[in-house]
Amino acid sequence: MSDEINKKEKIMQAALKIFEKKGAEKTSVRDIMTEANLGLGTFYLYYSDKNDLKEKMVLNLATDIILNAEKTCIQEDPIERYISFVDFIIDYLISHPFELDLLSKNITWTLYTKIENDYGLSEADSTLKFILNKYDNLFLTSHTESEKLYILSLTLEIMMSTCKSAVLEDSILTIDEMKPVLFAIIRKIFNRIGENKWKR
């Protein structure tokens, strides 16, 4: 790893640690660089400000989770494969509540924002388009790309809402009790989008 990449990653990891302790709003650039054991000026070689760092952090987290989830999916049936993909993400987020909170507050932006090639999502300019490239066979050819992206984003936002509900202290169901309901909804969405498209 080059010194430049190492410093950039070191700053990112330091920020993640401090954000989790103090919250992003109460964290200063100086706090981050003290944790990273780097000079204050080094920060501005890689990030324009704290918000720029936070945005890149959210994209890094999202792409890492998505890439790792995709590696675990081996089912031949496209719907069951997608459910396996969602299941991996749920388990990860439930085990990492801070990352769940960070991503849930930025879910729509994270899915749709344009990304650069260095995020590792080959042949896609957003996280959502990367997912569509992997799961395009869930849809009929008559669906437009915009329709496909909307449906995928809908299922992922429902997933995120489910995770947030599960970690509430007064949640009436555990995540293991919620999963079958969520997966049934996903199956219904993808089993029915091919039948009389958008019929009311």
Where does each model-flagged region fall?
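Hydrophobic/aromatic-rich alpha-helical bundle segments in the mid-to-C-terminal region
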Residues: 138-185, 196-200
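Generic hydrophobic, amphipathic alpha-helix propensity
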Residues: 7-15, 32, 57-68
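N-terminal intrinsically disordered/low-complexity leader segments
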Residues: 1-6, 194-200
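Alpha-helical DNA-contacting segments of helix-turn-helix folds
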Residues: 47, 53-61, 103, 123
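Hydrophobic alpha-helical connector segments
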Residues: 56, 70-96
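Amphipathic alpha-helical packing segments from all-alpha helical-bundle domains
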Residues: 70, 112-153, 180-183
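Helix-turn-helix
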Residues: 10, 18-52, 56
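Amphipathic alpha-helical segments used for helix-helix packing
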Residues: 94-118, 164-168
